[in-house]
């Protein structure tokens, strides 16, 4: 029977006893009430999720504790729930988990229940609630929190021993046992990455894990760090799933996008635009070509990664301009080929469309306008089928026009008669200003027989003129597929010093050993160690230093 119901039963029974007038007066030992209370308690213990008590009740118990008043069992449970609670009436007071004065008393209360085997599941759930609710990005730096973690792990065994039959919630806790260890989140993250079915929603309810818990951050940190352990084809297969996670977990969306884009940049696919990844990045972070958005991008990814996406957009715009927006002429493959060579150097591109392109209701045009909303301008002053393309390379803006017979115009940034981000541009006043352009080049003589390594005709003249402006064609960097199984000797220089004490220990541990070391932490990845042959001594030491084993890859370990 719960303490409240038991007290009520005793008070009513005592009142009736004292007011009894004769032998015929109603006698009632309240068996039905006691039975109902017992049934309620059993149902409570069977429940998958134990509801969190109101903050008002938790704070009342915390205040009684600080006033050194004697607490009932129920009040102690409220204290266990409130170890991470801030009291708005006393903003200068630390939470109990950070209170060196009062936490020892709480610690003794928990230890007493553990030693006497009287810790109930509701008490254990209350401790779990505080453990996961503690607001600290690195909770392990708090020794009181670490003590609590140990009590919860021990307390589970006490609770389990008191239950005759194993409950479904117990199986979930035991499967995700690492949540009460320094390796918290490892099992869940590996399970998620492997695409295995999981009981994450059940765990969230059973272990009283709030949405704001440090555990979710830990899970995603571990999960995203493991992307670096995947080979490129494996990673490519995971991108759609990662984008699904980004849509589902808004709180970690930026972290997921940062890790995915960075990993893609370091893959062999870098120069191949990933349509879904590009669209998601534009939706969440806007256009990296716009000056107003570049600071936002640089909050999340390095400049080379942002440049990769800008290159994707430039290639996309060039393809659309010379194919979809060719006006009333044929596709100019020569101009498309020439400018694609510079796409990876283009920091900004803008398509300026005439009336026909804006009003065309063909499915290709409708889709194009929808996907590029906010990235298109209106062209006035020309023929309805005219379109223009603005490209920024280094300090210059280059303007091409749809259809043949138009020269290319180039302007120095800061001296151009137009703002390339303007919503409306005039073909004659802005884009074809002979007096302010630094270059005006026709597309003659005709270019024929060109290929990836050879240019002909007018392209040769263009290359010469661009070199005078300090612009040279740079072949796209060849990115080799790295076989993670390949063997190479380990040396101290393979490991960068980021955490001096730990990284120096790792250097000395792997030096001269038969293993492969890959340190990509400065690129947002992980430090991984693959032992070529089993070595129990080294593997134990790696675990002690905080490394985690890689799922399905024996003798391989990683650390962030």
From Swiss-Prot:
InterPro entries: ZorC-like_t1, ZorC_EH_Signature_dom. It holds the Pfam family EH_Signature. Keywords: Antiviral defense. Transmembrane segments: none annotated. GO terms for biological process: defense response to virus. Component of antiviral defense system Zorya type I, composed of ZorA, ZorB, ZorC and ZorD. Expression of Zorya type I in E.coli (strain MG1655) confers 10,000-fold resistance to phage SECphi27, 100-fold resistance to lambda, and 10-fold resistance to T7. While most T7 infected Zorya-containing cells undergo abortive infection, a minority produce viable phage progeny. These eventually accumulate to a high multiplicity of infection, leading to culture collapse by 2 hours after initial infection. ZorA and ZorB probably assemble in the cell inner membrane and exert their effect there. This is Zorya protein ZorC. Disruption phenotype: When this gene is missing the Zorya system does not confer resistance to SECphi27 in E.coli. It comes from Escherichia coli O139:H28 (strain E24377A / ETEC).
